[in-house]
Amino acid sequence: MAVPIRGVRPMRWVGSLVAEGLLVALLTAAATSAVAAGGVIAIDVGHYREAPGVTSAHGRPEFEFNRDLAAEIEAQLQARGRSTQLIGAAGEMNSLPARPRAAAGAALLVSVHHDSMQARLLSSWTYEGVERRYGDRFAGFSLFVSRENPGWRRGLRCASAIGAALIHAGFTPSLYHADRKVGENRAFADKRNGVHYFDRLAVLRHASMPALLFEAGVIVNREEEKQLADPAVRGRIAAAVVNGIEECMP
């Protein structure tokens, strides 16, 4: 049997609890909505273990650089309350179209890579008893968007914002991809911020959401590779990428 509490009407007491519960639920929902207001940011780890991309000047596969930087970008996004999705981190995703499909529903797809240069521009050297290929001629980051992506204009805004944030943080765009002779003649979408058009790039054109590809630096460049492998530098790059995303996806 319920024991009445002196001075309190039972139905009013129950109603108060119900109202309080509803208030808590509403506040929780509002907080959750605020965190996810910018939508999910999908971060694609470029390449996979069986085809790990370019080999760095010191013999490390690109996939490992991509995985480490993507994880740092995700961690910093989450630290700012952003919802994230990491794609391909296990190194088993061998289908390019599967990557944007995995990101379905995300607000933005960022594919993380590290750069090389044309084979004819590379030289040979020996490191730890193994002959390696390197090229010290170019360094710096680059960004790419595809006009075959339905959200390419937003993708371009985000790429430009990321490029601007990287420059503000002290990094330099490579720019050589636009050169007819030493690059691939990739037209500039935003030269100042190191953004190029790459319309046929599969991971971008197959995406249903705004998408961009980020080349963090040139790992066949012996000096730049050392910098890109430094956790402190990686943290600075990730912070700049996140600042750019925050600018274009408020």
Spans of features found by a protein language model:
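Boundary at the C-terminal end of the N-terminal hydrophobic targeting segment
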Residues: 31-38
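Short glycine-rich His-centered loop
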Residues: 39-59
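Bacterial N-terminal signal peptides
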Residues: 16-30
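N-terminal secretory signal peptides that target proteins for export/translocation
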Residues: 1-14
